[in-house]
Amino acid sequence: MKVVKEFSVCGGRLIKLSHNSNSTKTSMNVNIYLPKHYYAQDFPRNKRIPTVFYLSGLTCTPDNASEKAFWQFQADKYGFAIVFPDTSPRGDEVANDPEGSWDFGQGAGFYLNATQEPYAQHYQMYDYIHKELPQTLDSHFNKNGDVKLDFLDNVAITGHSMGGYGAICGYLKGYSGKRYKSCSAFAPIVNPSNVPWGQKAFKGYLGEEKAQWEAYDPCLLIKNIRHVGDDRILIHVGDSDPFLEEHLKPELLLEAVKATSWQDYVEIKKVHGFDHSYYFVSTFVPEHAEFHARNLGLI
């Protein structure tokens, strides 16, 4: 893992990194914001800074949210690091959408492990996000016994659009092992098996077999996962989102949790006048940051 660039932001530093991934068999870029606490000389040696992983949406790179969502102010306020991974493998050798569209292929990896060629060789994004990347960051930053950042245990996950889907899916798939302390999402795709974006991705990456789709669909996963304690999923979506009715359909998640142990623990806030942009995301980042900070034990 090598440092590409560093920027002073708020009270901390945004670091742009690249590394060779065993999961995707490509070079991957990732941004991380280290809050002011990381650089404080009086930071307790026995304390570790928790991490929030933010998964971006279709077409995005690690730069979009790190430049436009304004997470850094909240990271400094509460004391967590935030990781901005890429949305897919990239490169001339990486298969892309044969139609040249922006909703599949490079920039649209859907955070799953592809089983269909020519995508299976590189599009192993589930393993990359939830297994390899946290371990790689831990090895890079926590050297020589100087362990200040927690990428493995006290961790939360969130995301926007395709990334909101990826956050909920990863949270649910790792729920029994308590992989993430909390999950939230901005305008997520909640039922990919039943909307055009998701169907295109699932057919291309997973094939026609619906049993494979079920392993990555939050509305199907959540029915078979028993809720514990007071764990909640927080979701915001704008009522002026142009993708709301065709691709997002948040009401399908509420229908899926009816009469399950999750029924009272999925909160979807539909906010008036907001669209799908980072104007929407940045407006509600403070509420999501507080939600995660509470679950990470920071407040």
From Swiss-Prot:
BP GO terms, sorted: formaldehyde catabolic process
Superkingdom of the organism of origin: Eukaryota
Activity as a function of temperature: Optimum temperature is 50 degrees Celsius.
UniProt KW Hydrolase keyword: yes
UniProt-recorded Gene Ontology molecular function terms: carboxylic ester hydrolase activity; metal ion binding; S-formylglutathione hydrolase activity
Catalytic reactions on record: S-formylglutathione + H2O = formate + glutathione + H(+)
Main localization (coarse): cytoplasm
Binding-site positions, Cu cation: M1, H140
Alphabetized InterPro entries for the sequence: AB_hydrolase_fold (IPR029058), Esterase-like (IPR000801), S-formylglutathione_hydrol (IPR014186)
pH dependence per the UniProt record: Optimum pH is 7.
Cellular component terms per the entry's GO annotation: cytosol
Function of the molecule: Serine hydrolase involved in the detoxification of formaldehyde.
Other remarks in the entry: Present with 1750 molecules/cell in log phase SD medium.
Subunit structure: Monomer.
The name this protein goes by in its record: S-formylglutathione hydrolase
Organism: Saccharomyces cerevisiae (strain ATCC 204508 / S288c) (Baker's yeast)
Lineage: Eukaryota, Fungi, Dikarya, Ascomycota, Saccharomycotina
